[in-house]
């Protein structure tokens, strides 16, 4: 089967992606700086390699993609409030880390990069349902970072032929979610 890199693979969403890939027989390399993820989310398996590192650090992305066929890029600081408090730090993680990963993927001839984006790029538009043709209107550094990452991915497809897909997640919740997440209590609100 394939060798896949999952950035942010110790996080809430990433750890579930790793589980699914391993269950289907793929080998997985996880790169996570554990700033928002937890090592306890990572299953122990001979098919899983864990590397604790920051993608924005020089050389890390090149090492991360070495020998992989495709990438699921979930590493980020996924917090609007944190991006408002510390826009430089979140820009480094969400934009510079993504750009480094795309460049390294291009250089390593990775087949495809699938990356997480966010519905936050739509801003406060009341139009429903949301769709990809809508005009982005980011209202926070986090939303802008995700839009920039999408644009970088599209640019790498056009300029270099690197296959990229950006997925705009909406309020994801479930097992392994941090209890401190602003969405962790959403089910109780929906069922009340």
Feature map (PLM): residue ranges:
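N-terminal Rossmann-like NAD(P)+-binding domain of SDR-like oxidoreductases, especially those catalyzing
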Residues: 1-172
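Glycine/proline-rich active-site loop of Rossmann-fold NAD(P)-dependent oxidoreductases
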Residues: 147, 172-188
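Generic alpha-helical structural context detector
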Residues: 103, 188-192
